[in-house]
Amino acid sequence: MSRVPVDDHLMDEVGGLHAGALLTAIDAVGGYLAGIVAQPDGIVTTSLTLRMGRRRHVGPLLCEATVLRKGRASVVVLVSVTDEGSGGAAVASSIMTCGVLARESPDPTIGRGVHHPMAPPHQDPVSLVDFFGIQPGSGLITRLEIGDYLRNTWGILHGGAIALLSDLAAVRAVRSDTDTDMAQGDLSATDMVVHYLAPARVGPVEGRCTVMGARPDGTVVRVAVHDAGVDDRMVALASVTVCPL
């Protein structure tokens, strides 16, 4: 279980937490639970899904994780998200799959019942774009520079960072697409599916978008994420639905 603040610098154009930011939190809380049940082995996220029901949030958001399945090779976790500031209203549902990695020298046991109080708001917070090293721009390609603080214990880019890159890249792509009527007005990502294919280690990492077309509830964008510093290898593939207000 984890609480996520809904501060101004974390919000999208519609008035809710960025879908990519929410997936970052989900990756953390779900991954922590998966890490507990996979001990003494380690885990790495292989896929994340998000279905957003309520798009405007008061906060804090409560993320509650439940193990759906623990196997030898993977752990599947359900994360349910509610808005404590809106009387516990349902916000989103996510399913994540983590691959189990054998450790040559197991880390110390991960404790259960750990409590970390939510930190108070920063007086001068850094925007999501700046914190995650996402370069300004528009069009079908969005770039992220990997900072050391964005790496996990395996030395690779956090899955949440790739989710946020996919979110912002998809919104930029829809806004710049001349075949849609959503160039103006508020947009946000609502539904996301992210499959992690290989580790991103060097960077820069690019989200390369293809606008697949419109459906009644929004525009679907495919985001291919590549590590330009390692033979332009594809490291993730995402499908993102971008919706107007």
Residues of each region from the PLM?
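Generic structural detector for well-ordered beta-strands
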Residues: 3-5, 9, 51, 97-99, ...
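Short, basic and Ser/Thr-rich N-terminal targeting/leader segments
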Residues: 44-46, 70, 75, 130, ...
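Generic, ordered loop/turn and secondary-structure boundary motif
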Residues: 11-12, 53, 57, 129-132, ...
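Generic secondary-structure boundary/loop-capping signal
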Residues: 3, 7-8, 45-47, 88, ...
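Non-catalytic linker/capping segments at the edges of enzyme domains
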Residues: 1-3, 101-149
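Hydrophobic beta-strand-centered segment that forms part of the acyl-chain substrate-binding groove
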Residues: 14-17, 30-62, 67, 171-206, ...
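Hot-dog-fold acyl-thioester-processing enzymes
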Residues: 3-31, 145-173
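HotDog/MaoC-like acyl-thioester-processing domains
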Residues: 39, 54-121, 196-206, 212-245
